[in-house]
């Protein structure tokens, strides 16, 4: 437990940022899983779910939660899966 005032503030800030980042990553993963599940099941709204997943990946990448290469790789794999 920090004693210095600035260290106490950093702990609070870090916890808040960690919660926000975890939430954003979770949303991204959920969107990708929904797309995968819909594609496997042969649902009608696969295009919409694909767009939502790509949007979630782009948001995570722009916030620095995932690297640009991972974002591109994930989107490419999903696009290839959509085309099948």
Curated annotation (Swiss-Prot):
Under the heading SUPFAM superfamilies, the entry gives: Ribosomal protein S20
Of the GO CC terms on this record, one is: small ribosomal subunit
Q: Which cysteines are joined by disulfide bonds?
A: none
Superkingdom of the source species: Bacteria
Q: Which UniProt keywords apply?
A: Ribonucleoprotein, Ribosomal protein, RNA-binding, rRNA-binding
Q: Which GO terms describe its molecular function?
A: small ribosomal subunit rRNA binding; structural constituent of ribosome
Q: Which InterPro entries match?
A: Ribosomal_bS20 (IPR002583), Ribosomal_bS20_sf (IPR036510)
Q: Which Gene3D superfamilies match?
A: Ribosomal protein S20
Q: Which family does it belong to?
A: Belongs to the bacterial ribosomal protein bS20 family.
List the PANTHER family.
Answer: 30S RIBOSOMAL PROTEIN S20, SMALL RIBOSOMAL SUBUNIT PROTEIN BS20C
Protein name in the entry: Small ribosomal subunit protein bS20
Protein source organism = Ligilactobacillus salivarius (strain UCC118) (Lactobacillus salivarius)
